[in-house]
Structures are given as structure tokens and as C-alpha cells.
From Swiss-Prot:
Any GO BP: glycolytic process
Top EC group: isomerase
UniProt KW keywords: Glycolysis, Isomerase
SUPFAM superfamilies per the UniProt record, alphabetical: Alkaline phosphatase-like (SSF53649)
HAMAP family according to UniProt: ApgM_A (MF_01402_A)
Pfam families in the cross-refs: Metalloenzyme, PhosphMutase
Species this chain originates from: Ignicoccus hospitalis (strain KIN4/I / DSM 18386 / JCM 14125)
Role of this protein: Catalyzes the interconversion of 2-phosphoglycerate and 3-phosphoglycerate.
Pathway membership, UniProt: Carbohydrate degradation; glycolysis; pyruvate from D-glyceraldehyde 3-phosphate: step 3/5
Protein's name in the database: 2,3-bisphosphoglycerate-independent phosphoglycerate mutase
Length: 416
């Protein structure tokens, strides 16, 4: 029995709702997607609750589900995945946090957030991270290390005795709100110590960054200064995730540029590749991702391709760029089909919906597409939120990999 390759393409935040400016259509309905529509016509489509009905997934919990794990059982915080995705080693007892370079102003003795992403485009990020690592390497005997992820994002790893991830964020998650003080979420010495350390990191980052030459240059150009690091999503890796090799016997690779998602992929045993020109934004070189995926399929059983630009555009409420990135994903699928049609099982899905009118993740079901050479087609003939309702699939996120394994002739029998 011939085993087929497996290709999973995820359009981050690609799911949407009706957009009035598009004549009450979704970006997927408006975008030109000949390859997605042809795959839908020849394959099976439907709706998927990535986590559970009505539950807005984070990108980390969503990908745990797409990789076949129950996020309610395995999720222990976003920070460790972000750190793994930028190549950090996160050991037992370490605390990892997700961070944003942000812009704050001093108002009435408080630091008030005016831009949570410091304009998002931040070519000075490596320079700022270097300054932080030189001037803020230790707090209360705890080693502190900053890692640049993509755009405005950083990961921070704390190493030392007596740490806890049971602490709140310093990121207020809203513009116009003051920077928060991290609080212990449990009355333990470890949580209290970690909260103090996180507060010290946050407010010292402001002292280091506010007058940094890179920020002076940004202000001169009319750009928002990246003058603080806001922290959130503390987590510890208490238990090792089972790998795809251990669970399914497959060798897998991930193609993308978003640290958080690549960290989840790395945690489940995938080899991680960031292609030339991949940025994690709308300016990514998606053709480079497609070429890289084709090459990797020569040596790997499964390749996962992540397209982040759809989500970046959604969070900005940018309909035009969302449509552009959907069409980029369609190109990636078409390019891969040119090489592996008949030789692979293809699955395409968002990891969650990020409607451009909401600008945040929502719990809407997302359109999912499955195509394999001998799969019996259903009645769906286009790929979008409305058209896939004619399809046969109505699944959870963690069911998708089982379907891919089944149609690639790799599924293991359950029972005698």
C-alpha cells in the first residue's frame, strides 16, 4: 500500500464574517482563489471548530489541536512556545514570556500605552534586543534573556531558582490603558518573586529604551518609538509534548516565520525552516515558502506551511491586504499541487477566524478543505465560509490530522 505525503497549509486568522464594504461578502468570497476552489471541487470541505464551538482559539492552542493534541490537556502557556520558536532552550523550572515592543507615554506619573505594537514594522528590533540583553541580564539573581521573534514581538526567558508562571501580565492588552503591574496569581513565594522580577524587567526596559538612539531615529522619522517591552503569557514547560514521530511515525517539517507557531511545531518534533524572505507579515515572500515546501517534501512525510499575513491584516482591519494574502495562499497551494498532485494529501484551513470588522480572534467555525487522489468528492465546489457548508466535513481541529493520516494510508488501526 503506497503511503502519500501530507501537506497542511494554514492561513492564520483567515476565517471571517460578512464585511459591509465587500457587499456583505467575506474576504475569502471576494478573493481570486482558483486553486482552492478546484481543490474544493475535487475534494471534501466543511466547517471546523478548532478548539470547541464558540471558543476563540489562540494561535498556540489552535496549532496544538491541528497537530492532534487536546489543548485543554497539553497547553501550559504561550511563552514557552514563543521562546522555542526563536531557538531558545526552555528547561524545567524556566519561565518564558511573550513580549511586545510597544509605545508608551508618561501621563500623570503613569506609563500609558499608545501603541501596543510600536507601529508593528520594527527594523531596529535586533538593536534594541541587544541593548536589553547588555543592560538587563539579571534581576534578583534571575538570569534574563531577550530574543527577537518577528516584527514587534520578543520572547523573554527567565532562569533561576524559585520561579513560577502563576503571574499576571504587564501588558494591559488595550491602547489608552496604563502599563499593569504583574501580580502573583497564587499566594506562594515563587509567584511573588516572579511578579517582582517581571515588574522590574518591564519598567527597566522603559528606562533603557526611551532614550535609545534607535528610538530617537524613529521619532525623527515620525514613527512611534519602541520604548518599552510589555510582557504576557508566562508559562513553564512542565511536561514534554509527544512528537508526531512518537504518535504517528511521521517525519515532519514546518515552513514559516512566526515564532509562536514555529515553537509549537518544534515542540511536537517538527524540524523548523524559515525560508529566505519570510517575515511573518503581509510583506512575506510566499513564493519562497512554496519553493521551500516542495524541496522539503522530498525528504519529509509531512510539511506544514504557515501563512501569517492573513492574520496580521485582520488585526489591522485591512481588508485589501487580507484578500492579497488569501490569494498568496492560493498560489502556494497551486504551486505545491503542480509538483505533488496525486502524490500527497492536502489540507487547508485557518487556525481561527480573525474578522476584519472585529480585529481579534473569534470562536466562529472555520472553513476546512481536504483533498486526496482517491477521496470521494462532496457537493462543495468553492472554498469559502459560505460555500463549504455544502461539504461533508463537520469536525474538531484535532480530527484533521487523523483524516490526513487516513487518506495518506498512514493511519494505524484501532483494535484487533
Amino acid at each position: 500500500m503506497k503511503q502519500l505525503k501530507m501537506v497542511l497549509i494554514v492561513g492564520d486568522g483567515m476565517g471571517d464574517r460578512l464585511v459591509p464594504s465587500l457587499g456583505n461578502k467575506t474576504p475569502l468570497e471576494v478573493a481570486s482563489t482558483p486553486n482552492l476552489d478546484e481543490a474544493a471541487r475535487r475534494g471534501q470541505a466543511g466547517l471546523m471548530d478548532v478548539i470547541a464551538p464558540g471558543v476563540p482559539p489562540g494561535s498556540d492552542t489552535a496549532h496544538l489541536a491541528l497537530f492532534g493534541l487536546d489543548p485543554f490537556e497539553w497547553y501550559e502557556g504561550r511563552g514557552p512556545f514563543e521562546a522555542l520558536g526563536v531557538g531558545a532552550e526552555v528547561g524545567p523550572g524556566d519561565v518564558a514570556l511573550r513580549g511586545n515592543f510597544a509605545t508608551v507615554e508618561e501621563r500623570g506619573g503613569r506609563l500609558v500605552v499608545v501603541d501596543r505594537r510600536a507601529g508593528r514594522y520594527l527594523p531596529e528590533a535586533e538593536e534594541l534586543v541587544k541593548a536589553l540583553n547588555e543592560e538587563l541580564s539579571e534581576v534578583e539573581g534571575v538570569k534574563v534573556r531577550f530574543y527577537h521573534a518577528t516584527e514587534h514581538r520578543v520572547a523573554v526567558v527567565l532562569k533561576g531558582e524559585g520561579l513560577s508562571d502563576e503571574v499576571s501580565d504587564t501588558d494591559p492588552h488595550e491602547v489608552g490603558k496604563p502599563v499593569q503591574e504583574a501580580r502573583p496569581l497564587r499566594d506562594t513565594p515563587e509567584a511573588k518573586k516572579t511578579a517582582r522580577v517581571i515588574n522590574e524587567i518591564t519598567f527597566r526596559s522603559y528606562q533603557i529604551l526611551k532614550d535609545h538612539p534607535a528610538n530617537k531615529r524613529r521619532v525623527e522619522k515620525g514613527l512611534p518609538p519602541a520604548n518599552i517591552v510589555l510582557l504576557r503569557g508566562a508559562g513553564m514547560m512542565r511536561k514534554k509534548l509527544p512528537t508526531l514521530q512518537e504518535r504517528y511515525g511521521i517525519k515532519a517539517a514546518a515552513v514559516g516565520a512566526t515564532a509562536l507557531v514555529l515553537g509549537v511545531a518544534r515542540a511536537v518534533g517538527m524540524d523548523v525552516i524559515v525560508p529566505p524572505g519570510a517575515t511573518g507579515g503581509v510583506n512575506t515572500d510566499y513564493k519562497s515558502k512554496a519553493r521551500t515546501a516542495v524541496e522539503l517534501l522530498k525528504d519529509y512525510d509531512m510539511v506544514f506551511v504557515h501563512i501569517k499575513g492573513t492574520d496580521a491584516a485582520s488585526h489591522d482591519g485591512d481588508v485589501e491586504n487580507k484578500i492579497k494574502m488569501i490569494e498568496a495562499l492560493d498560489y502556494v497551494l497551486g504551486y505545491l499541487l503542480d509538483y505533488y498532485d496525486g502524490e500527497a494529501v492536502f489540507a487547508v484551513t485557518p487556525d481561527h477566524a480573525t474578522p476584519v470588522t472585529v480585529k481579534e480572534h473569534t470562536g466562529d467555525p472555520v472553513p476546512v478543505l481536504l483533498y486526496a487522489p482517491t477521496l470521494i468528492p462532496d457537493e462543495a465546489v468553492e472554498y469559502n465560509e459560505r460555500a463549504v457548508r455544502k461539504g461533508i466535513l463537520r469536525i474538531r481541529g484535532r480530527d484533521l490530522i487523523n483524516l490526513m493520516l487516513n487518506y495518506s494510508n498512514r493511519a494505524k488501526k484501532f483494535g484487533a
